[in-house]
Amino acid sequence: MTDDDRIKLEPSWKAALRGEFDQPYMHQLREFLRGEYAAGKEIYPPGPLIFNALNSTPLDQVKVVILGQDPYHGPGQAHGLCFSVQPGVATPPSLVNIYKELQRDLNIPIPSHGYLQSWAEQGVLLLNTTMTVERANAASHAKKGWELFTDRIIQVVSEQCPNVVFLLWGAHAQSKQKLIDGTKHLVLKSVHPSPLSAYRGFIGCGHFSRANSFLEQRGLGPIDWALPPL
């Protein structure tokens, strides 16, 4: 049995990424994570949720991709979807700004929570390019191998899915544009929604309405960006 046979991954992703789990970088990443757990470090998100973005949004259902950097590093926040937090956790500042733009762009009331699972289940792949982090230690798992894996995920979406909208917010996300076939897909770029930059172009970008217009023009259902109450 190879390592990828033991990974709990949604079938379409497991088929598309078969072989990645036997690459040298993945063996190194696995050993790094084993060492972190063995040292008693608290790693987020919890193990069963590390691949939540993939398990919530099958490859053949991807309509929109939003890229984040690494998971939230506070207790109880991260659950494997970028920008999203678990129910009962305060909405982080960047997500508040995303909500402000949704309100401006589509007149959607600002939700009382930060749980984006309904977006994922509609085809929004909420992908952090680094998929784990140590508690209270931002970017602690950067450059350990995750970026190679998530680059491959972006490439697979670009190659195998038609008519996807990629929302690239900030320099880190925009560095991934080279992995995307811009002749097949819509790539929308803006500054990051963080409080440091949101009012330098994110607020006013219109990405959510533009994404839905693109999808509807191609006979695909729009995303309902309004979140259900918890």
UniProtKB/Swiss-Prot annotation:
EC code: 3.2.2.27
Record's subcellular location: Cytoplasm
NAD found in the keyword field: no
Coiled coil: none
Group of enzyme by EC: hydrolase
Keyword Hydrolase: yes
PROSITE patterns cross-referenced by the UniProt entry: U_DNA_GLYCOSYLASE (PS00130)
GO function term, MF aspect, one: uracil DNA N-glycosylase activity
Active site residues according to the UniProt entry: D70
A Gene Ontology term for the protein's cellular component: cytoplasm
Keyword vocabulary terms for this entry: Cytoplasm, DNA damage, DNA repair, Hydrolase
Record's catalysed reaction(s): Hydrolyzes single-stranded DNA or mismatched double-stranded DNA and polynucleotides, releasing free uracil
Pfam annotation, one family: UDG
GO BP annotations, alphabetical order: base-excision repair, AP site formation via deaminated base removal
Biological role stated in the UniProt entry: Excises uracil residues from the DNA which can arise as a result of misincorporation of dUMP residues by DNA polymerase or due to deamination of cytosine.
Annotated PANTHER family: URACIL-DNA GLYCOSYLASE (PTHR11264:SF0)
UniProt similarity note: Belongs to the uracil-DNA glycosylase (UDG) superfamily. UNG family.
Name of the molecule in the record: Uracil-DNA glycosylase
Species of the source: Pseudomonas putida (strain ATCC 47054 / DSM 6125 / CFBP 8728 / NCIMB 11950 / KT2440)
